[in-house]
Amino acid sequence: MSSSELLTSSYDFTLPEELIATQPANPRDSAKLLVYDRASDEISHVHFYDFEKFIPKNCALIFNDTKVIKARLFGQKESGGKIELLINRALDAHNIHVFTRGKVKIGTKISFGLELFAKIIELLEDGSRVVNFYKNDSILRFEEILPIIDKIGHIPLPPYIQREDNKDDEIEYQSVFAKEEGAVAAPTASLHFTKEQHERVCTKFTHAYITLHVGSGTFKPVECEKILEHTMHSEYYDISDRAKELLDSKVSILSVGTTSTRTIEFYARNKEHQRGEANLFLHPKNKPLRVDHILTNFHLPKSTLLMLVASFVGVDKAQELYKIAIEKEYRFYSYGDAMLIL
């Protein structure tokens, strides 16, 4: 391994702004798909509706069934000042980690309508906050908040999509098999599946679901030059019994997305824990142990997601594939095109 693989600057690249996808492919499976076969070093340029043709025989697919919540809320302080709040994750039953746009201090009360309000209970060093939510002065559990914010909240589009969310995003920024509420970012490789294609794949191939509630940390770039000094964010995961059975067997695994991959690989290193908090950082010096193939989108420069891709192919090959994708005008990021690494 070259020392450059451990430098954040090695994962930088220049992306033309017009290749940042701000709208999804329509239909979903019309997105382009770059297929890279490591054994033959061959690259194929197809569309996602061709995905099934490239799935290796006797391979099991693992999907992330997390569901994006309407985590972006607009409220008002008692002083009358407006404030934006982004739910990041539940720390426990009542304490919710959030980001706020606007100054708040401990004790600040923020009203959102429908008798829902939040109270700031802790200010964290990174500028984020911990809050409790209430309705009619009764403190709410996280699962009690969800049906309320589903009525008044907004889909939290990624920061690089420079537009307001709309009704279409409530459908498009969600996989067709999303089930377990809790994510504030979509597992984007999953977005390419239509309902029909997902059903066909699941009929033809062994499969299972894990849950990883994707947090906003997924968009955070690595800011230190030595990647081994980066502190990885933590997210809640749950390995279903069926997924555990497959992962504990010898079957070849195709992971749908980086979130499924992080979950599978965390479990491979911590088999005594079927659910809990995962904070695994995959990179060329910490390669996958259990995942054989990965379906993924094209990611941000200097991101842990690009470093995860490099854990499969190395940083030089990752940069080569990304250069080809840019030349071929693949669309990047959450609503963009896909890559399958075999």
Swiss-Prot record:
Disulfide bond sites: none
Q: What pathway does the annotation place this protein in? A: tRNA modification; tRNA-queuosine biosynthesis
Catalysed reaction per UniProt? 7-aminomethyl-7-carbaguanosine(34) in tRNA + S-adenosyl-L-methionine = epoxyqueuosine(34) in tRNA + adenine + L-methionine + 2 H(+)
Indicate the principal place this protein occupies in or around the cell.
cytoplasm
GO MF terms here are: S-adenosylmethionine:tRNA ribosyltransferase-isomerase activity
Query: GO biological process: any one?
Result: tRNA wobble guanine modification
Any idea where this protein resides?
A: Cytoplasm
Instruction: Write out the entry's keywords from A to Z.
Output: Cytoplasm, Queuosine biosynthesis, S-adenosyl-L-methionine, Transferase
Q: What is its EC number?
A: 2.4.99.17
What InterPro entries does the annotation carry?
Answer: QueA, QueA_dom1, QueA_dom2, QueA_sf
Q: Does the keyword Methyltransferase apply?
A: no
Q: Name one GO cellular component term.
A: cytoplasm
Q: Which Pfam families match?
A: Queuosine_synth
Q: Which domain of life is it from?
A: Bacteria
**Record-linked NCBIfam families:** PRK00147.1, queA
Q: What does this protein do?
A: Transfers and isomerizes the ribose moiety from AdoMet to the 7-aminomethyl group of 7-deazaguanine (preQ1-tRNA) to give epoxyqueuosine (oQ-tRNA).
What's the subunit arrangement here?
Answer: Monomer.
Q: Describe the family membership recorded for this protein in Swiss-Prot or TrEMBL.
A: Belongs to the QueA family.
What protein name does the entry list? S-adenosylmethionine:tRNA ribosyltransferase-isomerase
The taxonomic lineage of its organism, from the top, reads:
Bacteria, Pseudomonadati, Campylobacterota, Epsilonproteobacteria, Campylobacterales
Q: Which gene encodes it?
A: queA
